[in-house]
């Protein structure tokens, strides 16, 4: 009898700063069934063992006998190995939030040995300034570790990487041959570290099942190595593999050799398949591959429904060393820094994407195509429980695109409960994000959003079926930025039929977005054709020709293709990267776009004030929509004092309002009759459980009291001040 029914494992390597959420979500669900589970982030455990005094000592011993000739950069690290060995424990401790006083030594350059990645002082001053001592030190320690990682990759193990391991072998490996051959090679130093940690976990937990969550191609090699180790040393333990990689890449699996490493492979959401596996009745297996008589069989009892989102329990991080994760800053990109620095509770607001129509996205797969939201109350309950369990108040909502109306309800629920949280998420830059909604999200704790601008061309946005326009994107990013929320834009180039002119015009749009402060962070991605996207399913609609080789029986997702109508985009990548790097620094806006490219490119056809014009033309339509509900969401109501004021010998009843806004106090005086109405109105609007009051209702009340023109009232300093400080129309 095993002490633990299931050991959930995230194999090396994923993020260093926070756990990948899959095992915590599965543990939360299995807990509701009374199934005893344990979990481990094997990647973090291996990193901590490797980047330690003993780990580096052994690593350099291995390097000494390696037949690889070292280049000058690696030779320098090897010669300075005592410096690295003596500093690594404190460097790691700094990234874990301990030893913070070391920041001064690190930034002065008197503590860490300097390797090839150490940046120019000018770049450091731009990225962190004079006030960002802790972040600057964090960046330098990250580069120090990356120098060591480069050494490991060049001398010890070519597959090593902080957030991926042998990623090339797993990325759309149509045939299993190369990966199979690599798995049969002698174990590397990193492999042996992984096996050592895995053995300790197994001896500690004594599980009956080991379930490997493989989110990315960079986790596949190590996952299969783990499976092999289990089968060779613990043959009674059954091994299952699932996660994002299997769900996207292995939907046509026919090569039985993979079952030399695992017993089962499951697809899509893991809750139901795992529950059915543990029940043991093969005829009730759900979305599960097995190997029977040397043949791959797919078992899927479609009569068994998936577990509803509300019944999946709360993600449970028990067993993961939350205080041991490393907050790193790899590159000076604001959103990437947010992604990798700090520990975030990861949570999903809704299963699938509420839009689900983008031509490049895997809309035919369950994780995108089946939309099932939680309620705001359910999400807030989950957040409160996670805060209690982890002690962390930061949340990353990992939805493909968070539904705006659900975000609105969640923000109201957070404010209603007076929760103190910080959160960020992915969005679509759609018209629902009014300035009022963005201010509400900011007040509830939102600090950043990322969204897909993709190809900044209205023709291509329409072809992609993005459901947004450049005008809309400009106005919505302005709303987020005006509310104090950082905006990161996902950018794409090389979409089918995209011309060189459109790529350059897209860059000009991006330049203007940065120039006008609408976007603070961005990243260019080269379009990749995937098998499960509308483009991959219907290539004839997008002027492309599929050129992939015959399927080899293992993985299929990224597809080779030829763009018949579009430009050759190989020449654009470096120029797009360089220009964006400068725009994020606030530099290079005056340079002609040609300066960023080595090859001749077309001149842009976008007018210089293209984006500014969109902002100038925007109307405050929210204030004209009488059906919008009014909320007054300041923590306290104003203090009101009534008195008589003498004016030209006459006594006039007056109301004085003292508002305690977040940025200071403001006083307003108005007629006593108006004051009584406004005092009552703000009281009603601040009651989140009270009767709905729309802007039309407010206007009707105003007119019924014979106060005059409501349109004129909405132009007064009092109304404008209220609108900027907590009176939202939603």
Q: For the regions a protein language model found, what residue spans apply to each?
A:
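Canonical Radical SAM [4Fe-4S] cluster-binding loop centered on the CxxxCxxC motif
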Residues: 339-377
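Catalytic cores of alpha/beta
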Residues: 253, 437, 497-512
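Radical SAM enzyme core and accessory elements
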Residues: 2-11, 31-32, 46-164, 179-183, ...
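N-terminal [4Fe-4S]-dependent radical SAM core
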Residues: 179-182, 296-346, 647-652, 662-668, ...
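Conserved SAM/AdoMet-binding glycine-rich loop
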Residues: 6-14, 209, 236-240, 248, ...
